């Protein structure tokens, strides 16, 4: 349930909802990447450094989830039911209705329930979600939206990490994909509450001001267990990775009772429009934002030693629950971020456009033991040349500013990552944007990048210490094609190739694929227009990680592989449709965590969904 996404060799840690960012720490699993997509109209992905948009963030990408709004002036909606592998059942209702006779005030509610087991032993997940929003036209030029979102996710027997990868002799283990280290008593529960508001004011025909505001609270409570060890092939006994540091570090895993809350208050006010200068039309956008994010987490930990588990060959989840000590404060910090930003698109000539922008960010974090404050100005410059009505080329530059949550051997947080992002590209647009293509070449330069020392922070519960490294470079090329090839044929195709190295020429994050190819297509049969068939292929190249162990340097490796998915949809009546999906058609066994433990991806699975629209 700890879903992480990557782009251009780095983790995506900027998640936005309606343009308002939330920065999250991957070590605390608050479900940021698991929000139910039924609540959103679409998901936008902007690749590369996005400091002009968000103020901070990895030079990977930013994900913006756009909420559904009440757009209909008459009652309409849809309901769906889905059933699938591992006892999956899912029900969703999406309803819109006018609240006034003229439709100027409208409401939309989306609600759903999902329950499913897993290919993993003992696992079960139950999810409830709801969103309600009211959109009101206060006049010809003014619109107000206000809403509330709720999600509850309860998971029983979730895994925390994976299965021990190596034996003490350096050989690799393999397991049944159902094997899990989660005990019967483990759980991970999350509750999300958000209120939000948007006010839009148009001025004449060319200018608009937008105010976005949100307050969110995410709470979680979990008791889980992890195993981090090597297996003695002779008897299945586990050996800890830090045993050479002395008896106190001879643990082979641990249990954790973690609870906490993250609160975010954020405002974003901006205006955008066009202006005339030197006889040409240009565009301008400017604004300011403020966010306050408080993270408070408490925990209770216990180390697990080899005799407590016994032979791992016999482990089946019946590990006794820890006699928990009272929870103590693990983290309490508040991050304030204030930004002012502006950007303009200047038409230098009919085919040539200059884009200039900057964002000033004041970032401050206050913890229990110290405070850190940084001021940073993120410049952006781009040049777009329209070759003809269909083709254009561009070049862009921006800087990188990324606060970090990794700590050094003294326990202090590392200074923010800084750097530069360069990009060249070629775009095409056909049939009024029904079909688009993009080819991009990028180069990312970073300093202060966290690199693991492989040793724990003294006095911590085994938390790994990191050091800051300068001179990290990622460079590569991306290609995308999206849209309608014909009236009946839709195609999405993307390919990426990059390399990422540190200042000594060593690979950075070699556990992430350097080459990927993704394709998804659908085709509506002309002879039977009620029937649509399609599928997709995701391919990635070989990945690896070298890990220094007490027994030498071991390499974890996953060869290149492709996953194939299929679907078919049949429009039974004007209002009712059925869709069947098959994921991992060829039942490929693959490892999603090419590090010290093994985490298998989902085996072949099926689902069928019925949708009724009215």
Give the positions of each predicted feature:
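Acidic/polar loop-and-plug regions of large Gram-negative outer-membrane beta-barrel proteins
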Residues: 114-118, 131-202, 217-262, 307-333, ...
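Gram-negative outer-membrane beta-barrel transporters
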Residues: 349-351, 467-548, 586-589, 609-613
């Amino acid at each position: 349930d700890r879903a992480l996404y990557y782009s251009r060799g780095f983790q995506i840690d900027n998640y936005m909802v309606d343009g308002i960012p939330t920065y999250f720490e991957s070590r605390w699993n608050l479900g940021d990447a698991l929000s139910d997509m039924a609540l959103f109209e679409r998901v936008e992905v902007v690749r590369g450094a996005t400091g002009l948009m968000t103020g901070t963030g990895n030079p990977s990408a930013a994900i913006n989830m756009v909420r559904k709004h009440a757009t209909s002036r008459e009652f309409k909606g849809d309901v769906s039911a889905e059933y699938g592998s591992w006892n999956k059942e899912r029900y969703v209702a999406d309803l819109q209705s006018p609240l006034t006779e003229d439709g100027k005030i409208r409401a939309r509610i989306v609600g759903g329930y999902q329950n499913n087991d897993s290919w993993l032993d003992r696992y079960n997940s139950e999810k409830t979600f709801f969103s309600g929003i009211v959109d009101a036209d206060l006049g010809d030029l003014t619109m107000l939206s206000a809403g509330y979102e709720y999600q509850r996710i309860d998971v029983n027997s979730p895994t925390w990490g994976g299965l021990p990868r190596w034996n003490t002799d350096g050989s690799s283990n393999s397991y049944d994909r159902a094997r899990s280290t989660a005990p019967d008593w483990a759980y991970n529960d999350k509750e999300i509450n958000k209120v939000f508001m948007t006010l839009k004011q148009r001025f004449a025909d060319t200018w608009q001001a937008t105010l976005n505001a949100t307050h969110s609270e995410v709470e979680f409570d979990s008791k889980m267990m992890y195993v981090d060890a090597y297996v003695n092939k002779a008897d299945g006994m586990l050996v800890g990775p830090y045993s050479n540091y002395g008896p106190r570090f001879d643990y082979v895993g641990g249990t954790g009772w973690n609870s906490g809350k993250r609160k975010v208050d954020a405002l974003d006010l901006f205006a955008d429009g066009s202006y005339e200068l030197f006889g040409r039309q240009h565009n301008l956008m400017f604004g300011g934002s403020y966010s306050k994010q408080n993270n408070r987490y408490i925990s209770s930990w216990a180390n697990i030693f080899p005799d407590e588990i016994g032979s791992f060959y016999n482990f089946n989840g019946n590990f006794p629950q820890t006699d928990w000590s009272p929870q103590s404060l693990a983290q309490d910090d508040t991050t304030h971020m204030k930004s002012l930003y502006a950007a303009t698109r200047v038409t230098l000539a009919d085919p040539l456009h200059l884009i200039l922008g900057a964002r000033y960010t004041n970032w401050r974090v206050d913890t229990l033991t110290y405070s850190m404050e940084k001021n940073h100005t993120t410049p952006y410059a781009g040049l777009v040349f329209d070759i003809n009505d269909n083709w254009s080329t561009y070049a862009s530059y921006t800087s990188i500013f990324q606060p970090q949550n990794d700590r050094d051997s003294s326990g202090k947080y590392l200074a923010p990552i800084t750097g530069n992002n360069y990009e060249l590209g070629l775009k095409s647009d056909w049939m009024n944007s029904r079909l688009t293509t993009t080819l991009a070449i990028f180069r990312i330069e970073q300093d202060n990048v966290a690199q693991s020392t492989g040793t724990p922070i003294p006095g911590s519960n085994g938390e790994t210490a990191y050091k800051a490294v300068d001179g990290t470079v990622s460079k590569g090329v991306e290609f995308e094609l999206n849209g309608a090839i014909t009236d009946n044929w839709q195609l999405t195709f993307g390919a990426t190739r990059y390399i990422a190295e540190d200042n000594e020429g060593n690979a950075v994050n070699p556990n992430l694929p350097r080459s990927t190819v993704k394709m998804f297509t659908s085709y509506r049969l002309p002879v039977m227009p009620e029937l649509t068939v399609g599928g997709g292929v995701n391919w990635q190249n070989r990945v690896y990680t070298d890990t220094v162990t007490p027994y030498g340097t071991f390499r974890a490796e996953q060869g290149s592989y492709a996953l194939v998915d299929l679907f078919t949809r049949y429009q039974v009546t004007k209002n009712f449709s059925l869709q069947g999906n098959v994921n991992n058609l060829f039942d490929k066994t693959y490892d999603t965590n090419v590090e010290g433990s093994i985490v298998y991806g989902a085996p072949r699975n099926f689902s069928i969904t019925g949708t009724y629209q009215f």
